[in-house]
């Protein structure tokens, strides 16, 4: 009020005319500050102390006349020009007018002597008259308005809007009226610059937080202060520029719920399942067995990782059984007994150096290896003979006229008759090799051409009614050989450990 008196009183104007040094430089700008026609233009010294220009949105419908009267009555309006003009006051005031001196002293006493530090904070800008509503919360304007307009607003439906809560509320809720002569064109330009920038969602957008914020924002609609009359065009401008942040209504997201089946559908499904189970239970065992075998074969094939090949039946069934026995990891007792003789014969030949075999004369490999359990044509075992040389192996049993060991098969496996052991009435110990005359080898002579000794039989020589299981040749075509390692080497036949690898290999 005191500052108003100094500007309105007649003595002050007369002293100003007489003593121009007491007048404030550029005093013409002071009354122009209250007119809404043109913005204030201060000197360089005043621009240094002038607070930062605040780009806020003003509305043309405001009554500027009432605003001028309010500014004249508020003492805070006159404090700002007094602060800026005290730097040019003279050190000793003139004594022409006592009233002006007293008013100036009072005004100077109110001015703080500290240095002016403007940090562009909203608290110092708000010292000027701001028409605020009674419900306005000044704590929202703690952040500087310059920061709100300088940084780009990157808004999208997936953007965390909580970061821009203060800035958006400041721009949209309240029109900041710093001075009645605010430049409206500059404010609109700054708002358009902010909103025309590309809206790009940050990579780390928090969707749940933005949804909650939007829902809260629509529950409490923004209302302008009662003292301000905001036109509808401003809202249309904002809604056109930033469509992402404006949601018409806070509606919950639709949840895609699968319709539950009706009771009739459930009953029909349960009935179908029961019928399927009954059909499976009443199905034929052949179908289930075939499916099980196919599944087992497929599983075994995947496990081994090899391709299956079609099995071609052999002409002779005994060969199939022999092949199965050869490829088994653990032989049964019968097959193990058969190959155990071969194994024992090979080990004894390596130890003694005498290789005894039964083969055709022109073969390089033996059809059978002779061991201690092998039987001679005379009916005695090899261990019952005495090995003198390769040409003399007489039988040591009394009253036996056998002078040379002659091998004869004593087991049905050696002649390829594997099926005989499957008969219930078959006795392996009673089995003997027979001649075509239907008599056994024991009923033939042990020497010479082995004529038949049965009364009334006119068989002059033994002719086997079986074939060799190794070469499919008759018994009389084979011979028994007693050889040493040197003989084997000269005949280019396997010896040593090679005998175990090359058994039953015909010429």
From Swiss-Prot:
Residues 1-100, 154-310, 486-507 are annotated as: Disordered. It holds the Pfam family FAM221. The keyword Transcription does not apply. The keyword Phosphoprotein applies. Residues 167-177, 208-222, 270-281 have a biased composition (Acidic residues). Keywords: Phosphoprotein. It comes from the Eukaryota. Residues 88-100, 182-193 have a biased composition (Polar residues). The modification Phosphoserine is found at residue 270. Belongs to the FAM221 family. This is Protein FAM221B. It comes from Rattus norvegicus.
